[in-house]
Amino acid sequence: MSVLWSHCISKLEGELPPQQFNTWIRPLQAVEDGGELRLLAPNRFVLDWVKQHFIGKIEEVVSEQNRDSAPNVVLEIGSRAAEAAQMRSANPPRKTAPARKQVPNNLNSAFIFGNFVEGKSNQLAKAASLQVAQNVGRAYNPLFIYGGVGLGKTHLMHAIGNEILRGNPAANIVYLHSERFVSDMVKALQHNAINAFKEFYRTVDALLIDDIQFFAGKERSQEEFFHTFNTLLENKHQVVLTCDRYPKEIKGLEERLKSRFGWGLPVAIEPPDLETRVAILMSKAQQSGIDLSPEVAFFIGKRIRSNIRELEGALRRVIANAQFTGRPITLEFAKEALRDLIALQDRMINVENIQKTVSEYFKIRQADLLSNKRTRSLTRPRQIAMALSKELTSHSLPEIGQMFGGRDHTTVLHACRKVQELKESDARFMEDFSNLLRILSN
C-alpha cells in the first residue's frame, strides 16, 4: 500500500462512521504515480459513490498529509497492471499444497448472478458479491450481507459459490446454514472427532454460512467459529455470511465476532422498490413460460410489497389458478386469485401501524409525530413515517397527509423526496430507515 494512502486511511477511519469507512473507503487501493495518487475502486458503483460523497474529504486529508506537494487524486476502476504487481509483491505465491479431495458444496446451481434481478435495493450487494466471486479472499473478506427474510441474500450466496466454481471447478466451497455448523460440531464432540471437524472447515477455499444470527447464545459454537474464521482469513480464503440484521445488532453474539464481521464489507439488502418487483415478476413469468402483461405485473407488485419470496408466491398462485381453471391471466383474474392474500397484507401493514412503529423506534410520542411541532427530533421521524406509508401501503398522497394530522399532499411528497435524498447521502439515516423497513416487512 502507498505510504501516503496508509496515513490517509488512518485519518479517514478516525473521522468517518465505521459503516461508511468500511463500505466505501477501505475497498479503495492506491498507486502513487508521479504527481498523482490513483485510487482504484473495485467497480463502477463504488467509484460513482466515492466521487459523489467522499472525494472532497479524501482530497482534504491528502493535502493535510503532504502540504508542500500534495499529489492530484485520481479515481479509477481497478485493477491496473501496477495494482496487480503491487498485490503480487504483497502476496508472494504460496507453496503448492497437496491435492485435496473436493467436498460436497450444497450449492443450488439455479441461483446465479445471471437470473438475479438487480434494483436500487440490492445493487451494492450484488456488485460486492460479484467482486468477491471474481477475487476470492482479496476483495471483501468477510462479505456480510444483511436484510429481512426473502430478499435475495441466499440467492447471492449461492451465486457467489457458483461463480467461483465456474472460474475454478476444483475449488472447495462449502455452503451451509449456521445451524448445520452447530450440529456438525456437536456430532464431532460426541464422536471424539473435533480435529476432523476443524480440518474440514478450516481448509475450504470459501465458506458460505447463512443466517449467522443463529449462533447467538451458543458459546461453544461461537468459540469454534471464531478460530475457524481467523484461520480462513489468515490463509486468504473467502468467508461470506448472511444475517437478518447488522452485526452490531445481533444480541447474544460475542463482541469479538461482531467486530470481525465488520472487517470486510457489511452490505444491506432492502425490500425491492416497485420497479424491481415488477422486473422480478416479469422475469419469473418468462422463466415459467408464462406471458404476463405489464398491467398484471404492476398490480401484483403494488399489492405485495413485503419481500421477494411472498412476491414469487403470489405469482405462483396466479399461474396455478390459471392452469387449473384454463382462464387467461387478466387483471380481474389476478385480483380474484389474490383476494384473500391482499386482504391479509392490508391488515398487517397500515399507516397507523407504521406511525406506532416509527414512534417506538425513535422513542417519541405518537401524538407528537402527528402534531405541528417542527423540531428536528420530530421532523425526521415524521418524514420517514410518511415515506414508509407511501412505500408500504396503497394509500394516495392526500390520504397519507390526512392521516398525519391533516397535512397537504405536497408535504408528503416533499417528505418522500427528502428521505430518498438522505438515504443516498447519510449512512446513519440509511441504517435507521432500513431497520424500520425490516421491522415492518417482517
Swiss-Prot record:
What's a Pfam family in this record?
Bac_DnaA_C
Q: Would I find ATP-binding among this entry's keywords? A: yes
Q: Quote the Gene3D superfamilies the UniProt record gives.
A: 1.10.1750.10, 1.10.8.60, 3.30.300.180, P-loop containing nucleotide triphosphate hydrolases (3.40.50.300)
- Give me the ranges of the annotated region Domain II: 84-105
Question: Out of the domains of life, which is the source?
Answer: Bacteria
Region annotation (Domain IV, binds dsDNA) ranges: 323-442
Self-association state and partner proteins as the record states:
Oligomerizes as a right-handed, spiral filament on DNA at oriC.
Q: What does this protein do?
A: Plays an essential role in the initiation and regulation of chromosomal replication. ATP-DnaA binds to the origin of replication (oriC) to initiate formation of the DNA replication initiation complex once per cell cycle. Binds the DnaA box (a 9 base pair repeat at the origin) and separates the double-stranded (ds)DNA. Forms a right-handed helical filament on oriC DNA; dsDNA binds to the exterior of the filament while single-stranded (ss)DNA is stabiized in the filament's interior.
The record's listing under PANTHER family reads:
CHROMOSOMAL REPLICATION INITIATOR PROTEIN DNAA (PTHR30050:SF2)
User: What does the record say about domains?
Assistant: Domain I is involved in oligomerization and binding regulators, domain II is flexibile and of varying length in different bacteria, domain III forms the AAA+ region, while domain IV binds dsDNA.
Per its record, how is this protein called by name?
A: Chromosomal replication initiator protein DnaA
Native source organism of the sequence: Methylococcus capsulatus (strain ATCC 33009 / NCIMB 11132 / Bath)
Taxonomically, what lineage is the organism? Bacteria, Pseudomonadati, Pseudomonadota, Gammaproteobacteria, Methylococcales
The coding gene here is: dnaA
